């Protein structure tokens, strides 16, 4: 996130709604209540792991635990679950 109270936080894009992205991190921003943010206020950092990508593409919802695990894998912090 580039702006707002969540500036600098790493989040996973869980869905898209036109010019908006729905972001979650599995803790403060949970899967059932993702943050709605304009694309221009978000810096895309890179792709997620294959398992997470396939689950998102299959239209099934990620759990908060799966979101935290995907972010931990991306940052290399295996103990951040």
Regions found by a protein language model. Name each.
Residues 1-16:
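Short, charged/polar N-terminal "headpieces" of proteins
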Residues 12-81:
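Ferredoxin-like alpha/beta domains used as RNA- or RNAP-binding modules
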